[in-house]
A protein has these predicted regions:
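Transmembrane helical elements of multi-pass membrane transporters/channels
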Residues: 18, 52, 81-85, 89, ...
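Short runs within selected transmembrane alpha-helices of multi-pass transporters and secretion channels
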Residues: 18-37, 45-53, 74-87, 169-172, ...
């Protein structure tokens, strides 16, 4: 309540209760859709996402405005949309095309299978949960040193960074089954080729995006702000600092996805923790102690963290990849 305000807390609570009650549909859609992607049905997997998104776009105004449900209506629309996607996924996984069918006799908890799966899933879980902690830390520090304008700038920058990182994350998820399958089949050449393509393409995209942001930050800022000159000025200035090292961050994302694909849960988890928990979280609070411009120091923490984490991830990759592939 103290972080978001009492009025916002009441609205969020109404949304959250409905969303949590129906979250089983969200989990089923996200989890089972990966089994469609793994079999090579990328278009079907994409349709799963589109079905949920299109249904949500249609149902949102209906429940929010037509049925006068407000925020609760948005939650109902989201859950119903995900339920439609879940039905689509189930129908495909019980259809003629799929090789992996849902059968009652397969639904058994086997520790020798589920424990390694949980280990590999721990890294992305940590990444997602620490994202919330980082956002709280950034907002608290920027609110203290720069007020509402600095917090608003941070919100815009986080959205811009998502535009940069989401395609790379999708690329990595697409490469995972290719790397894992060929590694299991001892086709080391194909593994190396896939890893090389993943790293190169990820780096090219993040570098191109970074270069555009550094040269024309105002283009992205205008997408999120059209009314406040002060916010525009703050965000365009902060973008060059906050995203100063995101150009090379595609390397770390590719390396982390590679380690996950090769069954190296500990290395993948360490890289996930390194950037956010070990480096970024302390730097957000420590750097303003040593730099006069406190707002600049908070934004700079992201750049310093990115540089160190990419350097460490690259070193771990170069030192371990040959040993890992030798076990194929």
């Amino acid at each position: 309540r103290g972080l978001v305000g009492s009025e916002m807390c009441i609205r969020d609570r109404g949304y959250m209760r409905i969303y949590v009650a129906g979250s089983i549909f969200v989990m089923m859609t996200l989890g089972l859709n990966m089994f469609i992607t793994t079999q090579g049905f990328a278009k079907i997997s994409m349709k799963t996402v589109l079905i949920g998104a299109i249904c949500n776009i249609i149902l949102d105004p209906l429940f929010i405005f037509a049925f006068h449900m407000g925020v609760k209506g948005a939650a109902v629309a989201t859950i119903l949309s995900q339920a439609v996607s879940a039905v689509w996924v189930f129908s495909f996984l019980n259809g003629k095309q799929t090789k992996l069918r849902i059968r009652k006799e397969y639904l058994k908890v086997q520790p020798q299978i589920i424990l390694p799966v949980m280990g590999l899933g721990l890294a992305p879980f940590v990444m997602n949960i620490t994202e919330s902690l980082i956002n709280i830390a950034f907002n608290a520090s920027l609110s203290k040193y720069g007020g509402d304008v600095a917090v608003g700038a941070m919100t815009i920058l986080a959205s811009i960074m998502q535009l940069q990182f989401m395609p790379v994350q999708g690329l990595g998820q697409g490469a995972q089954p290719l790397i894992s399958y060929n590694y299991g089949a001892a086709k080391v050449y194909r593994v190396k080729k896939t890893i090389r393509i993943l790293i190169v393409v990820s780096l090219i995209y993040t570098m191109a995006f970074w270069l555009f942001v550094e040269c024309f930050p105002g283009v992205f800022v205008q997408l999120f702000n059209s009314s406040s000159p002060e916010l525009y000025e703050m965000t365009t200035w902060a973008a060059r600092i906050y995203m100063g090292m995101t150009g090379i961050f595609g390397i770390q994302m590719a390396i982390q996805q590679t380690f996950m694909s090769l069954g190296q849960a500990k290395l993948s988890l360490f890289i996930a923790c390194l950037r956010k928990i070990i480096l970024l979280l302390p730097l957000i609070y420590l750097m303003p102690m040593f730099i006069e411009n406190k707002v600049f120091a908070v934004f700079l923490a992201e750049t310093v963290s990115d540089f160190i984490s990419v350097a460490v991830a690259s070193t771990l990759f170069l030192c371990n990849i040959k040993k890992i592939l030798a076990k194929a």
